[in-house]
Every structure is written in structure tokens, then in C-alpha cells.
């Protein structure tokens, strides 16, 4: 849980080596970067809102990570965290985002006209298409550190802005605390709503405090455009629909996001963004675009093929199970999405998914015929 600065001052009575966490069994980016020397150098610092080094690393201390999956192991508590603790964050960002340097500049492109194709992914294989991102509202602490009042103010602002959306984006807000248990579970099962706060990241970082206060979901009438409020980020914006028309999903995503940003600006609020890190979000893994473009895709043959992991890696894609992170693939259905977030524009990332998915389908069709796929294995993108 985030500590006040007075607690941080109290801890400074002990030498740094007495306060340094035991990271000997850890497999996360934070544990890889944080040395006793770096801890000693940064531990007395705090951001203007009072977020400390121990607040940054606590989630990664409490969750050592997975032997095969490298987790990040740290969070930001406000926009300034990435600057105040840059000696820790910069190497983590470089490691996590494929060598992204502290001097690199991020590019943004939310013009769906720049996407080539994507309206014709074969619906016999692609069951659904989805694009999501996060946004943080400047002037507020991020979820690991925000107070009840801040969280409620974010909810109020977001609901006011979203209620101005019209046309096929028009919809309404559903506060978590006014939903029945059954209604909540139905939305979770249908992949519309975030899960209950059982994830170690949410719990250890303090993001689940006061749950379900000021949390909720806004969606349009046909549930193809959704905004989660006050989960891991202030806002999570999602465009989704059944079938393989990623172009339509991305166009709705860009239009909705642009309208939301305009509505916030009309109330004199802007999203956290800078030229180096792009859009600022709670977890360093989501910096840049914050964008994950994914499809649920049926690959019963390719999914079992020994070359599948290597093909995905070369296409800069990643797979999850049918139910998302840490779940199994059911019936040969995988959730396949872009692996990158930072250093590529939104259009570039969606393009990688569109082009990559077409190749995966071609490979699956070859395997259905009992033919080899060696000649289709791509070079590293």
C-alpha cells in the first residue's frame, strides 16, 4: 500500500541494506535492475504527491514472477514517477520494450485510413477482433496512489464526457457498486468487464483499495465500444466485435478515442503524454500506445505445431489462452495480439496484427491439408 512520506522518513532510520528487499527468487524486470546501490540512491526520493521507491517496487517484491513469463514488477503512482525514479524505470523500459532508449521519441498515429486492409480476416478462423488502450488524466495520481476523492472525481469527469458521445457510440454508464453479483459475473464472462480485484498486481500495488468505489463500465448500446473506469488505469478504452473486420474495429476505436480526448479538453483536462514515453500509464509495459490489438483465432493445427512460438515471435505477436493472461487455449482458440506497445505507432501495431493473422490462417490451412509450412515461416520483423 502506498506509504506517506512520514513513513518513508521513518524507514530512513535504518540503513539501506536493512531495508533492501530479498529479490533472490524473483523473475521480473524490477528485480533484474534494482541493486542495493540503486535502492540506496533512490529510497529517500518521492514524487510531489508522495509516491516513493518502495511504493514503485512493492508489487514486484510481493510477486516474484513466473519462471517462464517475465513480469514487470513495478508501477507508477503518478506522472512524475517515471522522471523521479528514471534510474530504475529507464533500464526496465529499455529491457521490456526491445531496447527503447531514454533518448528515443515515440510516435502516435490514430488515423484509421493509414491501415492497409484488415476488413477481410477470414471469419471461419477469426471469431472476434478487439483493440484496447489506456489513458490517464493529467493532474490526478494513478490508481496505485489515488485517493477516494480523486477516484470519484475521475469517475465523475469520465461519465460527464462519455455521456456526450452520440451516434453509434452513444451509451450509458454502469457503476460497479450498483450492479448485482450476477450482472457483474455475466459481464466478466462475456469479456466485457474487468475481473474482480483478485490479481496480485492490483492487490499488492494498492490499486484495489476501496473496491468497488468509483469503478464502473461505460458501453454503447450494442457493446462494441466500452470504457472501463478506475481499474488498472483511469480509463481503458475498448473497441470490439464478432468476426474478422479489424478495420471497422480500429476505425471505431480511433473515432471514439479522439472524441473522448476532445471532450476532456473542453473541460480543460488532457491526457498524460510526453514525446519520449507517449501515453503515460500505470504499468511500464503499457507505455507508448498502450495498445493491444487482438483476435480470438481458431488454430487447432498450428497451435500444436512446434514452430508456432517461433512464428509468433518473428511476427512480433504474442498469444494468450482463450480467457486472457495465464489461461489455457480452449478448442484450439488463441488470443493473438501485438507484443509491442512503445516505439511503434497505433497504425503500425494494428498492421502487424492484420498481416500476421493472415499468415497464421494460411499456415493453418496448409496444415489442414497435411502440407508443410516451412516455406511460409517469416523472417524476423
UniProtKB/Swiss-Prot annotation:
Binding positions for creatine per the UniProt entry: 72, 232, 285
Phosphotyrosine PTM positions: 125
Coarse class of the protein's main subcellular location: cytoplasm
Origin superkingdom: Eukaryota
Modification after translation (UniProt): Ubiquitinated by the ECS(ASB9) complex, leading to its degradation by the proteasome.
Residue numbers bearing the 3'-nitrotyrosine modification: 269
InterPro entries hit by this protein: ATP-guanido_PTrfase, ATP-guanido_PTrfase_AS, ATP-guanido_PTrfase_cat, ATP-guanido_PTrfase_N, ATP-guanido_PTrfase_N_sf, Gln_synth/guanido_kin_cat_dom
SUPFAM superfamilies: Glutamine synthetase/guanido kinase, Guanido kinase N-terminal domain
The protein's assembly and partners: Dimer of identical or non-identical chains, which can be either B (brain type) or M (muscle type). With MM being the major form in skeletal muscle and myocardium, MB existing in myocardium, and BB existing in many tissues, especially brain. Interacts with SLC12A6 (via C-terminus); the interaction may be required for SLC12A6 potassium-chloride cotransport activity.
Full protein name: Creatine kinase B-type
Organism name: Sus scrofa
Encoding gene, per UniProt annotation: CKB
Amino acid at each position: 500500500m502506498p506509504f506517506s512520506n512520514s513513513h518513508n522518513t521513518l524507514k530512513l532510520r535504518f540503513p539501506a541494506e536493512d531495508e533492501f528487499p530479498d529479490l533472490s527468487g524473483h523473475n521480473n524486470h524490477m528485480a533484474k535492475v534494482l541493486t542495493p546501490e540503486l535502492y540506496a540512491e533512490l529510497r529517500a526520493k518521492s514524487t510531489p504527491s508522495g509516491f516513493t521507491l518502495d511504493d514503485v517496487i512493492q508489487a514486484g517484491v510481493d510477486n516474484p514472477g513466473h519462471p517462464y513469463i517475465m513480469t514487470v514488477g513495478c508501477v507508477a503512482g503518478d506522472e512524475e514517477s517515471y522522471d523521479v525514479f528514471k534510474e530504475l524505470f529507464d533500464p526496465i523500459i529499455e529491457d521490456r520494450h526491445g531496447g527503447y532508449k531514454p533518448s528515443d521519441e515515440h510516435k502516435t498515429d490514430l488515423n484509421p485510413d493509414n491501415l492497409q486492409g484488415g476488413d477481410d480476416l477470414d471469419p471461419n478462423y477469426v471469431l472476434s477482433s478487439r483493440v484496447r488502450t489506456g489513458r490517464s488524466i493529467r493532474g490526478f495520481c494513478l490508481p496505485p496512489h489515488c485517493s477516494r476523492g480523486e477516484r470519484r472525481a475521475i469517475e465523475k469527469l469520465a461519465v460527464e464526457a462519455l455521456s456526450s458521445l452520440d451516434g453509434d457510440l452513444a451509451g450509458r454508464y454502469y457503476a460497479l457498486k450498483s450492479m448485482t453479483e450476477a450482472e457483474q459475473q455475466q459481464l466478466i464472462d462475456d469479456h466485457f468487464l474487468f475481473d474482480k480485484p483478485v490479481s496480485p498486481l492490483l492487490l499488492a500495488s494498492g490499486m484495489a483499495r476501496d473496491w468497488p468505489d468509483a469503478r464502473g463500465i461505460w458501453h454503447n448500446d450494442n457493446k462494441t465500444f466500452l470504457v472501463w473506469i478506475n481499474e488498472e488505469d483511469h480509463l481503458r478504452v475498448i473497441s470490439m466485435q464478432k468476426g474478422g473486420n479489424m478495420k471497422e474495429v480500429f476505425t471505431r476505436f480511433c473515432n471514439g478515442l479522439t472524441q473522448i480526448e476532445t471532450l476532456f479538453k473542453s473541460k480543460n483536462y488532457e491526457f498524460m503524454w510526453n514525446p519520449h514515453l507517449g501515453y503515460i500509464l500505470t504499468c511500464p509495459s503499457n507505455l507508448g500506445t498502450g495498445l493491444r490489438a487482438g483476435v480470438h483465432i481458431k488454430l487447432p493445427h498450428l497451435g500444436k505445431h512446434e514452430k508456432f512460438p517461433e512464428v509468433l515471435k518473428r511476427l512480433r505477436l504474442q498469444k494468450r489462452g482463450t480467457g486472457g493472461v495465464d489461461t489455457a487455449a480452449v478448442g484450439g482458440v488463441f488470443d493473438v495480439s501485438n507484443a509491442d506497445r512503445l516505439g511503434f505507432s497505433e497504425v503500425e501495431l494494428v498492421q502487424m496484427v492484420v498481416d500476421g493473422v493472415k499468415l497464421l490462417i494460411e499456415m493453418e490451412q496448409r496444415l489442414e491439408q497435411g502440407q508443410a509450412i516451412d516455406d511460409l515461416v517469416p523472417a524476423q520483423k
